[in-house]
Amino acid sequence: AYEDFLQNARDPAAIHAMCEYYRAAVSVDFQQDQADRGTRKIECPVMVLWGAKGVISKWYDPVGIWKDWASDVRGEEIDSGHMLAEEAPEPTYQALRKFFA
C-alpha cells in the first residue's frame, strides 16, 4: 500500500487532485459546514479513528469535535501513525468490526 501511495504522490495529476481536495476543505467545504452548523446532526452512529503516533489527539479532542455534528459518536485511538489501515491493519479492522457488529 505504501508503494501505491508513493507512486500516486509522484503523479502530477494526483498531486493536483490532492491540492484541490485540501483547497476545497478550507474554502467551499468550510463555508458549507458553517452554514449547516446547528441546523441538523448526523443521526446514524459515527466512528472516529485516529493514530496514537500522530498529532490529532494532541491538538484536538477527536470524539468531542464530532459531537457537534453527530448524535452518536464513538472513537478509538489506534497504535499507528497517520495511515491506520496500512500501519496497523489488525487493530483498525478490530475497531471497525466492533463498530459495525
What are these regions (language model features)?
Residues A1-W69, R74-E76:
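Conserved serine/cysteine hydrolase catalytic core
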Residues D72-A101:
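Catalytic active-site module of serine/aspartate enzymes centered on a nucleophile-bearing elbow/loop
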